[in-house]
């Protein structure tokens, strides 16, 4: 069971990164949810085996490059998902058993990108993406180019507003028509288009693409006593608020509303993927609180994905950077979710065996997250006399013997010199989330590798203009740009480099946590797995994987070569000061401050080592209360939590 929990944790973390960070999931929502539920059940049965990097303990995605990081004043949580009436009923029973008077507000789940807007004295100061729920991207200039977001409020408020940025169906159609005319690749769906737009560095493009928003949450003020009144207040302040919602104490009414919305969703001018059900009374929300991942007072009902039938014509097998061999089905073309689909992932050999998928089968295809086509099941009634799927025994790239480890679902090539494995590793190193070397994509990597110019990541920093000009299709101007991008990457903070090395289990978030703790990549040559496991957010498996990598002689040699080439090995971000006055304390701000605005107060608390949260609980160590403090102060007094005022904070 321990191995299965580790395997599920790794798989789900990979899929989370694909969905939240790259906006390109490789598995369907339903496949992800099936694996997630299996993990939840195993963790409930074997709680001692819960890993610190388990997706059940995490929120959202990791940070991308290209924009400054932004530390959220209050975490942005994910939502618990539901896929059936029974799950909604279970949610209802859990809530009503503790709070019989609870009402629900059902709101549309907009298929967009979560945003957070910070206002100081009524002026928009920061617009940010969710990121991993704690650290997002500062996209303020792009946010200011969304027409329906107020730049200044009618009241001088210090407040954070949360919601979704999206692209309407009409705007999506227009932009894809323009891209088609210009010979550019079309966006797969409006969510992808919205995500790509918000990450544009040219703000004129953002303004042109006509993004819109729906806002639904107010954080940091205590001016409303219900979710419905919060929506009304947001509308009064000038925000766009979705008018399709239902208030009821009956889950029967909520279910009728969900069914009605699902039946008419295609008539809406924007895309939705479900309905969010929230406890309406904010006082009850406060009492229910949060798990590490999601609020206990809300649940998201997800609509099933669109499905179509297609025939499998053939199967391609490709090798990834970790050696995993992935099967992809070539299909008879079919229209699915607005695009023509002719290829779909088959995930792995265990999935093929479990579904008994064969070449020539008619299969049901759907889009994972409305993006990546995947095979869901075989239409047994249409099967003829097809033979079972031939499974390769040799690597399609290097012809080495493939292995299928007992605790894994995939075939794997374990030849470290496999051309596909090496090339995918180089592509990963150059990717946006890693070293962000613009121009070093798959086509250029293949040319460099085939020419014998690069075999590992250190070779990238040995490339010269003369080397690049020997390659087909590489002109002097593009070669100079690539060399400039390589040179620029040398100055990256070391967590980008650590992630780019592609060490198993070491994702972008783990890389940041490790470098925050140790400060320098060379320090990792002497750490132990047990020491690494003490870092909050990591586990022993991550520690063991990192130590195993850096114990190799070639790892020390690689670091030496990178350092000699001028690549930065130090962490450039802010590291926690364990001697700070409030280090390790969980602090809540409430009420109106006279001398500091809320952002200044939060920054001061964080500089003093505190973790600032938005709600009072038994885990809260300290409450800093201003004038007109409301329910948070009362709850802190009830729980016997230490309470201080603004002057106390200023004097620290």
Swiss-Prot record:
SMART domains: BRCT, HhH1, LIGANc
Residues binding NAD(+), per UniProt: 29-33, 78-79, 107, 130, 164, 278, 302
This protein's record includes keyword Electron transport: no
Keyword terms: DNA damage, DNA repair, DNA replication, Ligase, Magnesium, Manganese, Metal-binding, NAD, Zinc
Necessary cofactors: Mg(2+); Mn(2+)
Catalytic activity reported: NAD(+) + (deoxyribonucleotide)n-3'-hydroxyl + 5'-phospho-(deoxyribonucleotide)m = (deoxyribonucleotide)n+m + AMP + beta-nicotinamide D-nucleotide
Top enzyme category: ligase
Molecular function via GO: DNA binding; DNA ligase (NAD+) activity; metal ion binding
Binding residue positions for Zn(2+): 395, 398, 413, 418
Function: DNA ligase that catalyzes the formation of phosphodiester linkages between 5'-phosphoryl and 3'-hydroxyl groups in double-stranded DNA using NAD as a coenzyme and as the energy source for the reaction. It is essential for DNA replication and repair of damaged DNA.
Family that this chain belongs to: Belongs to the NAD-dependent DNA ligase family. LigA subfamily.
Descriptive protein name: DNA ligase
